């Protein structure tokens, strides 16, 4: 269970929670590997909208993500086509960043990233839009 989180108290909670310590079924493994195959395909990469803001976060000590190499590879593959792609890697953190010892920092970083995008959307909405097609050239005050 140590691979999941850096917080010893949460490690104990995970170890004692039957919903976290169950054995994966053959079907679950099949579905997981099918999903992994799809999200690593050229088809999937081609379907990701270029304007979609993406933030990848990972713990550098997460064995599931190959110690942040997996996240970095996906981000590198998307970086040429994406207009807003960010990567944040956390030293000494593992798989579940939101239950680790640095969770307050992670939550603050997520909130900052989200607020930056909301501020950008709000600024764009406040910018007057010119309606040229209707004959009148008034500012469109869409909200």
Residue ranges and their predicted role:
Residues 63-73:
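Conserved alpha/beta-hydrolase "acid-adjacent" motif
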Residues 1-19:
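Alpha/beta-hydrolase-fold enzymes
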Residues 48-54, 83:
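Short, proline-enriched alpha-helix->beta-strand connector loops that line the catalytic pocket
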Residues 84-138:
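Catalytic active-site module of serine/aspartate enzymes centered on a nucleophile-bearing elbow/loop
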Residues 60-63, 93-94:
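Acidic beta-to-alpha connecting loop that harbors the catalytic carboxylate
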Residues 56-58:
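Short beta-strand/loop motif that positions the catalytic acidic residue
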Residues 25-46:
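Active-site nucleophile elbow and catalytic-triad environment of alpha/beta-hydrolase enzymes
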């Amino acid at each position: 269970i140590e691979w999941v989180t850096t917080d010893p108290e949460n490690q104990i909670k995970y170890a004692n929670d039957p919903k976290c310590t169950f054995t994966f079924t053959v079907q679950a493994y099949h579905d997981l590997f099918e999903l992994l195959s799809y999200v690593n395909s050229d088809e999937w990469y081609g379907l990701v909208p270029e304007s979609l803001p993406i933030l990848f976060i990972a713990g550098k000590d997460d064995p599931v993500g190959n110690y942040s190499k997996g996240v970095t590879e996906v981000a590198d593959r998307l970086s040429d086509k994406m207009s807003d792609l960010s990567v944040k890697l956390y030293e000494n953190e593992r798989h579940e960043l939101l239950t680790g010892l640095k969770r307050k920092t992670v939550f603050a970083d997520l909130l900052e990233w989200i607020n930056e995008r909301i501020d950008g959307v709000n600024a764009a909405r406040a910018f007057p839009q010119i309606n040229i097609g209707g004959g009148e050239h008034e500012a469109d005050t869409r909200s």
